[in-house]
Amino acid sequence: MINPVAIRLGPFSIRWYAICIVSGMLLAVYLAMKEAPRKNIKSDDILDFILMAFPLSIVGARIYYVIFEWAYYSKHPVEIIAIWNGGIAIYGGLITGAILLVIFSYRRLINPIDFLDIAAPGVMIAQAIGRWGNFINQEAYGRAVKNLNYVPNFIKNQMYIDGAYRVPTFLYESLWNFLGFVIIMSIRHRPRTLKQGEVACFYLVWYGCGRFIIEGMRTDSLYLAGLRVSQWLSVILVIIGIVMIIYRRREQHISYY
């Protein structure tokens, strides 16, 4: 089993979970800043947004998780703030981040569609990296299986949980997001391929489809009224993404990326 603590500095410790999250965020910021000039967005605007949105999105992701696990946290309120032990929901962070992005864009007189377009690839690769934090924390896994001979030993050993091997759903989602990142980075600058806003739409459809399938394999899903919340949200993302693509394709006045 991999030690979830990467570095100890006296009474303080730095966990692999935090390293994965922060590494993904830094890469996302780099990619957004590199693309920002194409959309006439200042690098300072990117940094200002990240400094505001990153901590608030983490809080939003935690609140989302706690709400759907209230039966546990109502009895252990002290653990609500123990975010270093894991327990954040990506959808909570995405919803919070999207709301903040729209508000920030209007305040800075930035087209929010452009901002979403430059942010989407970075978010996708950040999610791919962040899932490895779940791996080290032994969370976001699937049902028990007899063996995991198709994965490297270090993954197989870490996925031995509660006396059984578990489907490495974290790995599936990480690879799915990485593949989506490669695709969108390969086509977004091709002439007359994507219209303004369609990079973000691609993210909605791609991530929504993958998450819907992978969520069905997990055993730690958040439920509401007996239904997997993330699957419902995935369906909503896919519908929004497809509707927006159809609309943007029909409107001649919308420019290409």
From Swiss-Prot:
Bilayer topology: Multi-pass membrane protein
Principal place of residence: membrane
Highest taxon above the source species: Bacteria
Chain positions recorded as a 1,2-diacyl-sn-glycero-3-phospho-(1'-sn-glycerol) binding sites: 131
Cross-referenced InterPro entries: Lgt
Keywords of this entry: Cell membrane, Membrane, Transferase, Transmembrane, Transmembrane helix
PROSITE patterns associated with the record: LGT
Pathway the protein takes part in: Protein modification; lipoprotein biosynthesis (diacylglyceryl transfer)
Transmembrane region(s): 12-32, 49-69, 83-103, 109-129, 167-187, 197-217, 226-246
UniProt KW Cell membrane keyword: yes
Coiled-coil ranges per UniProt: none
Location in the cell: Cell membrane
Family that this chain belongs to: Belongs to the Lgt family.
Protein name: Phosphatidylglycerol--prolipoprotein diacylglyceryl transferase
Name of the gene encoding the protein in the UniProt record: lgt
